[in-house]
Amino acid sequence: RRSSDLDELTGALIGLAQAVGEDKAEPETDRLMMEGLFATLTNVNFDDDSLKKQIEAVHQETAKYVPGCMSCQEPCGRTADYSMEKLWQDQEDIRSLKSLLLFGMRGTAAYAYHAMVLGYTNDQVNAFFYKGMAAIGQDREMEDLLPLVMEEGTVNFKCMELLDKANTETYGIPAPAKVEMKVEKGPFIVISGHDLRDLKLLLEQTEGKGINIYTHGEMLPAHAYPELRKYAHLKGNFGTAWQNQQKEFAGLPAPILFTTNCIMPPKDSYRDRVF
C-alpha cells in the first residue's frame, strides 16, 4: 500500500516538473517539490492519508502552471502524472540510471528542505529538481541520463554546503562534546531524526518546565552545536541506532518526537507515544 502511494506521489511530482518546464518555479512550488521528494525517502512517512493530501496538493500546484490542461479535450499527457510502473519495467540500464537519479534527488531534497526551514535556499539546487524529475518522465537514452546523474552529484554537493552553512550560521560551529548515555529520573522527551530546528523549538518550549530532552539516533550530533548544547535540560542521548527503535522504544515511559527519515512502522507497544 505504501509503495503504491509513494509511486503515485513521485508520478505526480514528475507531472509537476513537466508543467513547470524551464520556467522559474514559485517558492511554494519549490517547497512542494522538496517535501514530496523528501516524503518518498525510506522511513519518512507511513501515513496514507498524509501522502494522499500531498498528492492532491501537487495536482493543484500543477494546475496553476498549465490551467488549460485540466479542460483539454485532446490531452497530450505531457503534464499528467507519470506512471512509475513504466520506469520499473523499463530496459535495465535506463531503469538503473533513472533510479539512481531519482534516489539521489530524494536525498538532496532532504538536505534542501532542512536548509530551507532555516531560511537558506539555492536556485541551482531547486532548479535541478525540475530538470531531473522531468527527465525521468521522458524517453531518454543512456547518453542523456549519465550526465544528469553526474550533475545530480554536483548539485548534491552544493546542497550539502548549503545545509552546512545554514546549520553553522544558525547554531554555531560544531565542537566535540561529551554526551551522557544514561536517562535521569523525571519526565523526559526523546527526539529522533536530524531536524535541528525541531530540536531547537522543543528545547525552547520545554525550558524551565522540569522536562529533560534526550536525542536519539541521527540527532546525536546536535550536542556538538553550541546554540543547542547551551540548554541545560538537553541531558544526553537515549538508545542506539535507528534500526533498533522498535525494541528500545517498547518500554520507554516517554513520548518520542520523530523529525525526519528515521521512523520505522511503530509497534502497538509505543504507537500512542509517537509524535
Model regions and ranges:
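Core alpha-helical transmembrane segments of integral membrane proteins
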Residues: 188-193, 198-208, 213, 242
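Long, charge-dense tracts
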Residues: 98, 108, 218, 238-241
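Short helix/loop capping segments that flank catalytic or ligand/cofactor-binding pockets
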Residues: 199-201, 223-225, 265-269
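Phosphate/diphosphate-binding loops
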Residues: 232-274
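Electropositive, gly/pro-rich neighborhoods at or near active sites that engage anionic ligands
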Residues: 10-173
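Short connector loops at secondary-structure junctions
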Residues: 215-233
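General beta-strand structural signal in soluble alpha/beta enzymes
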Residues: 171, 191, 213-217, 257-260
